[in-house]
């Protein structure tokens, strides 16, 4: 009986750990607005990957989640890198409020990589 309880506790802990890792390291994001249209559509939900910054450098052409100068989370495509600063632009430039208006963003402000 004791072995059964220990096994059950281990299984519950493993399942709980799986959900914590899945939801914290790979959170789903709601796409709001049309600044990334047609790549991302308003109302879609996409997975992202946190902590990529510690293991790999940002790559031009990928879509990232970062904090803009007002500390708001933003999803845009990386267009240019200069030293530790990144330049992001939306895929729909006529409606996108991006680095064209507020300049380069420190690489440390990147929160996650959007998984496509």
Which residues make up each language-model segment?
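Extended hydrophobic leader/signal-anchor segments used for secretion and membrane insertion
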Residues: 1-116
């Amino acid at each position: 009986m004791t072995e059964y309880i220990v096994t059950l506790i281990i299984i519950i802990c493993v399942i709980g750990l799986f959900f914590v890792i899945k939801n914290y390291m790979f959170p789903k994001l709601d796409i709001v607005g049309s600044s990334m249209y047609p790549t991302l559509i308003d109302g879609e939900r996409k997975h992202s990957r946190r902590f990529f910054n510690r293991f790999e450098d940002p790559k031009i052409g990928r879509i990232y989640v970062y904090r803009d100068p007002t500390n708001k989370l933003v999803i845009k495509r990386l267009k240019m890198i200069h030293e530790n600063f990144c330049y992001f632009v939306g895929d729909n430039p006529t409606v996108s409020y991006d680095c064209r208006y507020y300049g380069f963003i420190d690489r440390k402000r990147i929160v996650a990589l959007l998984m496509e």
